[in-house]
Amino acid sequence: MILGLGLDVVEVARIQRILAGPPARAERFLARVFAPSERAYCDARQDRATRYAARFAAKEAAVKALGTPEGVRWLDLVVERGSGAPSLALDGLAADAARRLGVARVHLTLTHDAGVAVAAVILEGTGP
């Protein structure tokens, strides 16, 4: 059963402006929003702003799918990239919210084109 659905669109230029801005501001943003593994993945790519935008969209979509629980931190949501499709790991208050909803599986899809990054998150489970 589908327990939650979240969708988000991020303009890549918005992230590019942050990355190209004052280094201290960019670092604060990256440290507050992205886990070290996400940063390593994005920073190793030529299109790093696009990669960051997709991950930011994934986090926003996940929060929407969870019902916008209070206190969830960006770092409670981590986009992981193995050899296949990306996945979303939940920790902290995000994991607590998922447990309360009865989430058994999190589906994530990312795409980017024409200057935007899009993410969709579907939460699947049996319910509370």
Swiss-Prot record:
Which EC number(s) does the record attach to this protein?
A: 2.7.8.7
Question: Is Transcription regulation found in the keyword set?
Answer: no
Biological process, per Gene Ontology = fatty acid biosynthetic process
- Keywords noted in UniProt: Cytoplasm, Fatty acid biosynthesis, Fatty acid metabolism, Lipid biosynthesis, Lipid metabolism, Magnesium, Metal-binding, Transferase
According to its UniProt record, which reaction does this protein catalyse? apo-[ACP] + CoA = holo-[ACP] + adenosine 3',5'-bisphosphate + H(+)
Q: A Pfam family in this protein? A: ACPS
Q: Which cofactor does it need?
A: Mg(2+)
Where, per UniProt, does this protein localize?
A: Cytoplasm
InterPro entries recorded for this chain? 4-PPantetheinyl_Trfase_dom (IPR008278), 4-PPantetheinyl_Trfase_dom_sf (IPR037143), ACPS (IPR002582), Ppantetheine-prot_Trfase_dom (IPR004568)
Question: What enzyme class is recorded for this protein?
Answer: transferase
Under the GO molecular function aspect, what terms does this record hold? holo-[acyl-carrier-protein] synthase activity; magnesium ion binding
The primary site where this protein sits is: cytoplasm
GO CC terms of this entry: cytoplasm
Q: Which residues bind Mg(2+)?
A: 8, 60
Job description of the protein: Transfers the 4'-phosphopantetheine moiety from coenzyme A to a Ser of acyl-carrier-protein.
Q: Which family does it belong to?
A: Belongs to the P-Pant transferase superfamily. AcpS family.
Q: What is this protein called?
A: Holo-[acyl-carrier-protein] synthase
Record organism: Anaeromyxobacter sp. (strain K)
Identify the coding gene. acpS
